């Protein structure tokens, strides 16, 4: 089938509690399909909404008191049965999950305050809906109107039967959503130009990146199996390329670390029970919550990661998850009377620390860092450090890593993994 012949998306927009309300369903259909006889619309449309896999976008908006602009709380999901999934969110998840508790509060105050888009297509299958769900998360992360974006997984799929249709089907979906609500769903070119889109954890990884990520996650699992038995800090050494390819992998990796190894306990899909059986979950345990940080040397990138973490609910305030190395060292240090940390006096430990551009860490003190060796200070404050390191990118004498530094920090248990840039 040619791209022009692909079936167009079927999109219904209705109040969230109205899935059982025949009148509301008919009203939503009439809005999209005009004066067509409902009996014909039912046969051609309702079948793909209620009997096929669908993707859904639940949203609620509040006005920002300072800017008077609308701010959206959004949940994106996919399901094989939209009716049952809606009932699950309303009756079960609203009692146990923070994201759905918030929607429930809003519904109690005003039944018209929470709506959902239900997206169907005659060519939808499980893999295709998972890809659509993942890209919707990716795009909505770059929407300025979205304040909070909820889901608990990255779902980019590998090869499958209708994969060659995905880009066209998604573009048609986004174009129609943009037509219906341009504030929540801005034009594609606006989304793709945003810094959050470029650093999003929802990019689809290449085979090399996936292999590197799985190796790192496996090494983390092994490291925690050891550190759960003793207090020895471990370091996972990742050798990688610079640029956008690295940023995409680091963002994707950190999101997986937080949502899988920190064990949020949220599973969105009834078919996702296998997530409970992952190696990392078995090692850590469902109720053993951990804290992870991402350290970045550049202030602008710290800001971008902070925005992503806040939108995805990984932190409640700024600088809780993404920090500069000096901020992290200060956070986990005994304090002087002026509030500054003492690098030689660690206080407490983070569970997992992901260090971007570890080659830029200082190996001697300077005006902004009173310690003697940043890599050493980070290890003393962390149970496991994942260091992304490229010795060819060292820029200053204060960042020079001597052979003895490398031998001391990267003993036989390190992970040395290189991934390459591929278009």
What are these regions (language model features)?
Residues 1-88:
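GIY-YIG nuclease catalytic motif and its immediate N-terminal context
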Residues 82-133:
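Conserved short loop/helix modules at catalytic or binding sites
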Residues 186-208:
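Conserved adenine-nucleotide phosphate-binding loops and their immediately adjacent elements
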Residues 201-234:
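N-terminal pre-P-loop "Q-motif" helix
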Residues 213, 217-220, 224, 239-244, ...:
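Conserved helicase motor core of SF1/SF2 NTP-dependent helicases
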Residues 235-239, 293:
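Short hydrophobic/aromatic beta-strand immediately N-terminal to the Walker A/P-loop
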Residues 249, 253:
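Hydrophobic positions on the alpha1 helix immediately C-terminal to the Walker A/P-loop
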Residues 273-280, 285-308:
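Conserved Walker A/P-loop ATP-binding site and its immediately adjacent core
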